[in-house]
Amino acid sequence: MAMVLMFTTCPDQEVAERLADGALTAGLAACILKTPVDSLYDWQGKRAAEGEVVALFKTSVAKADDLEKWLAENHPYEVPAIIRIGARANESYADWLAEVLEA
């Protein structure tokens, strides 16, 4: 079954937890993975190196637009990276995902 993986970077674990909890509570994601990363990027003409937390949201195709909008509205970054990837899950996981998101 088709599903969507959507990820964003957060400034810290607290923000990642807040976004994860909010998405779960709103029924927009069935599961969120969080992991610390080191990010290197250019911002406003300067090179930046920051510790961040990647939050990977697992959701349905039907909920993806709403999740993306919700993340954009609730993210603390001025320009958050909210990246959507189409994916395919094994049948039992896809059934669980659908059940959770329909509840």
Predicted feature residues:
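Positively charged, small/polar-rich N-terminal and surface patches that mediate targeting and assembly
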Residues: 1-103
